[in-house]
């Protein structure tokens, strides 16, 4: 009997732990159920939906103008980039073109949004692996950019500044001057971050060869943005399928070689420099003679008339009343419009039945595709690497849960 008992080997049992939903490295309300064999991750099960608000369904009950603020609340780190996709989709269904000055302002603020997003990601990624200084420097610069948002739209985050047909109102000359004055000192801050992190031995040990994604895997999983460029593909919608006035802009697409967390960090650092290049070009074009003019279409059946005009014209008052009560009707049809948001390809599939409300508005969030790959990326890594990988995916739960 004792011999029989002696031959029984105890069964090995994996350990299951919860990561989140209130974990400082979860970047929102993420719950990961991790199955561990010692310190090694065997399986990752993301539990999403904790920030689900039914955005797509809510938009169906709203006019096209009332739908715009919902897009600010998706990727709330860079709000105007999402508004851009929805406005482009509606404009293509309406068959209208945004005036050149309106396009330049849109591109300028989309690049500000890209820097807002990358600054947050790069600095919090550093914080996730133990560095404290980068977030303090990064948030100081983000504060200045938030002020530019506020001076254009009145709001630091939920701007609702883009409109179908253009932008809400023109930028004052002093704001354009201040944005230009911000650019060069910011490049120095990027250089300081670069010096602090890029060659740092501990930072490299935590990121090099961690979370490697091959190019084939990136395409199979529906990745976009930095996740694809980190694996070696120069795929950027601003170059591949130019929209607005991006075709005129001179900028480079940084790509990685290894597809690891470190490459994705380097790409985001370089993209911030390229965004500043685009911003400087936008500012120069806004000051040029051909950059003057209206910032939105002058069809008062789509874009509301100005206050001064409403005090003089009865028709303007009628148009204003109709637009803010019933809204405008969009011709029946369906369209897919995508923009290169900071986190990847943000797409809006808009279906109109000819009424004043969208029949269906399907949102394609880049973070959703990236999060579903957490299982295959993390498998075989250590528990400590999970937060580094999650940080390099750049996920925001407003857009994942919608």
UniProtKB/Swiss-Prot annotation:
* Catalysed reaction, written as an equation: a quinone + NADH + 5 H(+)(in) = a quinol + NAD(+) + 4 H(+)(out)
GO MF terms held by the record: NAD binding; NADH:ubiquinone reductase (non-electrogenic) activity; quinone binding
Note the topology in the membrane.
Peripheral membrane protein
Query: Where does this protein reside within or beyond the cell?
Result: Cell inner membrane
The protein's matches in Pfam families, at most eight in alphabetical order, are given as: Complex1_49kDa
Keywords associated with the record: Cell inner membrane, Cell membrane, Membrane, NAD, Quinone, Translocase, Transport, Ubiquinone
Q: Give the enzyme class.
A: translocase
Cell membrane: is it a keyword of this entry?
A: yes
Cellular component GO terms held in the UniProt record: plasma membrane
- Please indicate which superkingdom the organism of origin belongs to: Bacteria
According to the UniProt entry, what is the EC number of this protein?
Answer: 7.1.1.-
So what does this one do?
NDH-1 shuttles electrons from NADH, via FMN and iron-sulfur (Fe-S) centers, to quinones in the respiratory chain. The immediate electron acceptor for the enzyme in this species is believed to be ubiquinone. Couples the redox reaction to proton translocation (for every two electrons transferred, four hydrogen ions are translocated across the cytoplasmic membrane), and thus conserves the redox energy in a proton gradient.
Q: What family is reported?
A: Belongs to the complex I 49 kDa subunit family.
Q: PANTHER family attached here?
A: NADH DEHYDROGENASE [UBIQUINONE] IRON-SULFUR PROTEIN 2, MITOCHONDRIAL (PTHR11993:SF10), NADH-UBIQUINONE OXIDOREDUCTASE 49 KDA SUBUNIT (PTHR11993)
Its quaternary structure? NDH-1 is composed of 14 different subunits. Subunits NuoB, C, D, E, F, and G constitute the peripheral sector of the complex.
Protein name per the record: NADH-quinone oxidoreductase subunit D
Please name the source species: Nitrobacter winogradskyi (strain ATCC 25391 / DSM 10237 / CIP 104748 / NCIMB 11846 / Nb-255)
Question: What's the source species' lineage?
Answer: Bacteria, Pseudomonadati, Pseudomonadota, Alphaproteobacteria, Hyphomicrobiales
């Amino acid at each position: 009997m004792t011999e029989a008992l002696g031959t029984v080997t105890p069964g090995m049992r994996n350990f299951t732990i919860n990561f989140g939903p209130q974990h400082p490295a979860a970047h929102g309300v993420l719950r990961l159920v991790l199955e561990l064999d010692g310190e090694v991750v065997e399986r990752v099960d993301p539990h999403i939906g904790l920030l689900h608000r039914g955005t797509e369904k809510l938009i169906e009950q709203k006019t096209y103008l009332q739908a715009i603020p919902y897009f600010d609340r998706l990727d709330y780190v860079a709000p105007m980039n999402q508004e851009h996709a929805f406005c482009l989709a509606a404009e293509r269904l309406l068959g209208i073109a945004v005036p050149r000055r309106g396009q330049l302002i849109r591109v300028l603020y989309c690049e500000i949004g890209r820097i807002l997003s990358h600054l947050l990601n790069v600095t919090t990624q550093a914080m996730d692996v133990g560095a404290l200084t980068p977030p303090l420097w990064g948030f100081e610069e983000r504060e200045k950019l938030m002020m530019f948002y506020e001076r254009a739209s009145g709001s630091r985050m939920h701007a609702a500044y883009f409109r179908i047909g253009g932008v809400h109102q023109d930028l004052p000359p002093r704001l354009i001057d201040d944005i230009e004055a911000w650019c060069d000192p910011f490049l120095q801050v990027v250089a300081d971050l670069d010096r602090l992190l890029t060659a740092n031995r501990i930072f490299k040990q935590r990121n090099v060869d961690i979370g490697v994604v091959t190019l084939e895997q990136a395409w199979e999983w529906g990745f976009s943005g930095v996740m694809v460029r980190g694996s070696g593909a120069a795929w950027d919608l601003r170059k591949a399928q130019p929209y607005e006035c991006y075709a005129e802009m001179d900028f480079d697409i940084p790509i990685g070689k290894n597809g690891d967390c470190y490459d994705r960090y380097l790409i985001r650092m370089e993209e911030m420099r390229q965004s500043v290049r685009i911003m400087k070009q936008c500012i120069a074009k806004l000051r040029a003679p051909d950059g003057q003019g209206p910032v939105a279409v002058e069809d008062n059946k789509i874009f509301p008339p100005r206050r001064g005009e409403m005090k003089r014209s009865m028709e303007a008052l009628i148009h204003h009343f109709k637009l803010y009560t019933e809204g405008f009707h969009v011709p029946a049809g369906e369209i897919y419009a995508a923009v290169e948001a900071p986190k990847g390809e943000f797409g809006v599939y808009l279906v109109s039945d000819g009424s004043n409300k969208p029949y269906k508005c399907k949102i394609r969030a880049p973070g959703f595709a990236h999060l579903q790959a957490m299982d295959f990326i993390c498998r075989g890594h250590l528990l400590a690497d999970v937060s580094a990988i999650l940080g390099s995916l750049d996920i925001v739960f407003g857009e994942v849960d919608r």
